Amino acid sequence: MSNTQLSYKDAGVDIHAGNELVERIKGDVKRTNRSEVMGGLGGFGALCALPTKYKEPILVSGTDGVGTKLRLAIDLKKHDTIGQDLVAMCVNDLIVQGAEPLFFLDYYATGKLDVDVAASVIKGIAYGCEMSGCALVGGETAEMPGMYHEGDYDLAGFCVGVVEKSEIIDGTAVKTGDTLIALGSSGAHSNGYSLIRKVLEVSGANPADLLEGKPLSEHFLAPTKIYVKSILQLIKQTEVHAIAHLTGGGFWENIPRVLPDNTKAVIDESSWQWPAIFNWLQEKGNISRYEMYRTFNCGVGMVIALPEKEVETALALLEQSGEKAWVIGKIEHLGEGEAQVEIQ
């Protein structure tokens, strides 16, 4: 038996560092506040009232991470935008059902807390929340010695939104003849990064190598685009039948999630050009066209189905919101034995 008096810090957990982190992020968190949020940071639970404008409010929840994009961010020591990625992955899933994000919580876990790194990450989370109009109401910072390699950390996000019951977008309104509009992505977003890292490995490429005047690292770590405000505006002013968020599974798996069983999406491949980074990945990794569309968004972050009569208005609204938007295809009747997504 040792006579040495042990403390939690001796075991690798620095409560002082955790408190310092909270102080560092308070201002960033405060900027995300909504009038419905009651109280501040530090409570055992976060309180949030429902916005009074909703007659029959339905809560919509989601949780996500950023996959192995985090590995790339850690290796390249770029921590300031991965938080935006985390928020985007959650709120973009909520908006496809027409939900306005209300509040967000994060989970940050590491072996030894580096306050500078954690503060940078959480500032990015707060910025993503500001862009989404949702409040960062709390989170968990877990310092767990022996659980992670030195310098590593993990992230998860949790978001709750609200939608009027009569205005839920679930794809049931999709009809043959509907038009499909694409919203451009900012890059690979937060999907396909295990394949991206494999391509970097087998090609021997250096992340500092330039592509179209920018280092590959900038292309790969470009933060995921947040579509909340532009899509909320679109929903208010047009009749939207379905929205698909192109994440893991790409075109082949995400678009069918919002289509009735008797319909298919016919995508016109000539309607857009892949951003250069996707051509680079396909060439350097010798990746098939099918695999590209299954793994990556290939420049398309969202696909929106709406009646043909709404197209002109929708494109104008989206352009005003700063989105790159175009007609990418249409909805047709699904024949026997056909796939629900055709890319022609």
Curated annotation (Swiss-Prot):
Domain of life: Bacteria
EC number: 6.3.3.1
Pfam families: AIRS (PF00586), AIRS_C (PF02769)
Biological process according to GO: 'de novo' IMP biosynthetic process; adenine biosynthetic process
Cellular location(s): Cytoplasm
Key word Calcium present: no
Catalytic activity entry: 2-formamido-N(1)-(5-O-phospho-beta-D-ribosyl)acetamidine + ATP = 5-amino-1-(5-phospho-beta-D-ribosyl)imidazole + ADP + phosphate + H(+)
UniProt xrefs under PANTHER family: TRIFUNCTIONAL PURINE BIOSYNTHETIC PROTEIN ADENOSINE-3, TRIFUNCTIONAL PURINE BIOSYNTHETIC PROTEIN ADENOSINE-3-RELATED
Protein name: Phosphoribosylformylglycinamidine cyclo-ligase
Organism: Haemophilus influenzae (strain PittEE)
